[in-house]
Amino acid sequence: MATDIFLIPIPPQQLRNIQGWSAQPAHLAYRVGRGPHLFRAGGSVPLRGGVMVVDGQGYDGAGPVGPFCQEVVSECSVRGFSGAVLDFDRRLPPLEQLAGQLDRLFAQRGLALYVPEPFGHCVSHSRVILSSALSGGSLSQRLEEAAERFGRDRVALSLERSAEDFSLPSPTGSGTPLTRQQLRKQMDALRPSVFFSRELCARYYTYMDRDTGAHFVLFDDGDTMLCKVEVARRAGVSVFLAPYEDIRDCAGLLGLLPRSMQKRGPRAVDAVPAGE
């Protein structure tokens, strides 16, 4: 059985918070800038080891991507990074070309590349990132379909702690995102009966609003995050992206903390953690 790899997307200023964890930092410090060229944020915090996260927001699509790809490879070499995560939310042709070039360059050098699912068709060696947040269907089925499409050893799961309020019926399948504070406030006011969906690996409840009618609220907690990890493991997935802000209060539950740091708090079904 493959050993799990947890990549923790985290800003440079918070790196000390995951010291001692059984995980690798994914440095939220890079973006595609004009040129395109590789731009780095994070000030004077030294970055070493783990992987780099490259944000594609703000890139205008202009310029040849070859020099940029060489800059990424060079940065990995200088910083001792084992790879890179492409955090692209738009399918611009230059970004697709960039992903394809990095896929080949990284494979030649034994580096790991992780790309969002919409960019999966651009790569043949890299791992493809699926989101754990679903509003319908089955997480297990989604992982199986991805394994058939990309290969079982090329699928990674992004653990996204989500909470959404859906008006019923919901023809688009999209709800209103809730912060943890908003979710807790709503649950404190409604005191709803909370249920668990095995297919989605998420908790949910329903309520009626005098003005807007029936609502369905789907949300995650530490226990559902662990459930998603276990479902993914059974599907042969061993690489997880777990953003620090989403898992910081359930890192022990996920097995990321050394025993000396583990503290068992109340079950997440009984209380939604505060914080934003």
List each language-model region with its residue ranges.
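Chitinase-like catalytic core of GlcNAc-active glycosidases
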Residues: 2-138
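Well-ordered, non-membrane alpha-helical segments in soluble/globular domains
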Residues: 62-72, 95-104, 135-145, 177-183, ...
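A structural motif corresponding to the C-terminal end of an alpha-helix
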Residues: 76-81, 105-111, 146-154, 228-239
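A structural signal for short, well-ordered beta-strand segments and their strand-loop junctions
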Residues: 85-87, 112-117, 154-160, 240-243
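Residue-level marker for beta-strand->alpha-helix junctions and adjacent short loops that shape enzyme
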Residues: 91, 120, 162-164, 247
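Active-site region of glycoside hydrolase catalytic domains
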Residues: 96-100, 104, 111-113, 123, ...
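Glycan-binding loop/region signatures in secreted carbohydrate-active enzymes
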Residues: 154-156, 160-228, 260-261, 265-272
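Acidic/aromatic/glycine-rich contiguous surface patches that form carbohydrate-binding/processing clefts
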Residues: 228-276
